[in-house]
Amino acid sequence: MTTPALFTPFTLKDVTLRNRIAVPPMCQYSAVDGFTTDWHLSHYAGLARGGAGLVIVEATAVSPEGRISPGDTGLWNDEQAVGMARIAEAIKADGAVPGIQIAHAGRKASANRPWEGDDHIAEDDPRGWETISPSAVPFGANLNKMPKAMTQADIDRVQADFVAAAIRARDAGFQWLELHFAHGYLAQSFFSVHGNTRADGYGGNAANRGRFLLETLAAVREVWPANLPLTARFGVIEYDGRDEETLAEAIELTRAMREGGLDMLNVSVGFSTPNAQIPWGSAFLAPVSERVRREAGLPVASSWGIDDPVAANRVVEDGQMDLVMVGRAMLANPHWPYQTAMKLGLERPSWVLPAPYAHWLERYRVQSA
């Protein structure tokens, strides 16, 4: 039988994934001073053991001020890289490619964990810190803390932090690096008209608003191995009433990032305004991803609402995505790849899992036939 598209290998640079199922970064908010814990080790090993081809470690802050919450992981010192190296090795040992996303939360930083309010930490709470952003414009809604407008020195420092974190990720054994340029965090805020009111070379027209992203990419490209994938998650659309304009600008910037050494784009939503009218639904970003793939000329991945096996296979088969990012479905069922393989009729579906699981599942199936 023909192998379903979702279960065909995917090669980018010198890295080959066993299938097109990827686990996107999903913050666990369970770190201590940026350090990973046993929770992270078991969590990521379990996702890899479930059969995904790529497992990307959650948004990992490049500096203490870059954390979303006090529970975020970090790579701003060498000691934090020790725990990350254990995670990378565990993911690899269970058959997946270890990836990591490095990030700065910008004006959305200094927040309580989602289950503790999901709002900014109170000004008089010692757990909080000053936030920075391209401009002194708060996000709004539950995140209304006024950020400090960044100076050139701030920009230079943050970009140096990205470089240092990328080096630590490389040395920790990660084979796939994703830059977080999405979701209303710092880089997205530079690109977005909702977060950037600057009048200098980093603001105004789309080219200027994309400058921080291009400079950060170029700086990281210098230190990240040329044979390993360098990717970015980028909000190419906001659903704010100027969708066509934003998407056209985002595609133009994506072309520039591709020319600057970007290997793949993880297509997402901007989340730069609380007033967005997002059309939530199954694989709702698939047409957007397809357009980015076609017009920007590079491989794409995407997530959001892709939990149905048939839909996941179809977006790959139809050329809308090269990889499918499966998030919440993998949290609910880390063996989602196995159940998907069965539903799609993959021959010997048990063997998408490691042998210690697969032989029992296949043996039981044969005996009960």
Task: Enumerate the predicted regions with their spans.
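Flavin-dependent oxidoreductase catalytic cores
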Residues: M1-A369
